[in-house]
């Protein structure tokens, strides 16, 4: 699909986003989320101004909700909810009761006679997701700096890293790894700067300009990443969460200057907008095609994906914020610190 088709799709999508924004379900946002017990898991989401319960399809491995069954969740006149279950020959209804804590946050739901807890996320409490490091943070940097980067064979293009802020001043930077506001809880970069290989940087600027008519701009969380930082990620991250970090034995696309982590900000307010999960949140909600949340969140992701695809970027399935430039394989792994660029 070329960039012109992608931009037309993005424009149509944005019209739907505006319609939903004007009618939304703000009062019921608290109900949206991931619920589960004893291995069973389901989502409650908003779609077209209505609530739905999504149940993972049978025989689907993992918890990604790549396929699911959806059921309407309707609010009655007395404020209670009913789940509408449709079958080949009949329709049944089940009462749904939500539970709240002292702060009026939803903690669980009763379906029939079973109670399911609602999963909590750091972003919902104004916090940043953190891992439980597998090694002491104090020794991670020294170990990574002493490690040897993998040797690659083949011909590569000469690196031409350029600083993104110099390419377009309207790009916002929120380089989390230059602060302790990240999943590791410690600064990993000595400077809050962002670099990409020149063709990727130029394509990213075009996306940022295309977003203007939708009222958005790009916010950059990470771009080129020295290899030693990828090594730190890997050594610190628990085995079950390694799907969210690159194996240093292969290197990251960030290490080549061919990947970028981004979100959207409002050009009206200058503030980042809600994309349905926090950046670097190691959870189901981070998956690019996560079907939960509300329509605006999902459509913002789709708008970003469409415009980025039109300029040669592909989204990483497990991370809505991560995009790889088409030519990332053409560049070598790099371990150059920012102050040397």
Model regions and ranges:
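Bacterial N-terminal signal peptides that target proteins for export
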Residues: 2-12
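Hydrophobic helical h-region of N-terminal Sec-dependent signal peptides
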Residues: 13-18
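Beta-rich nucleic-acid/ligand-interaction surfaces
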Residues: 227-233, 323-330
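K/E-rich alpha-helical interaction surfaces of small helical-bundle regulatory domains
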Residues: 30-41, 308, 312, 319, ...
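N-terminal signal peptide c-region/cleavage motif recognized by signal peptidases
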Residues: 21-22
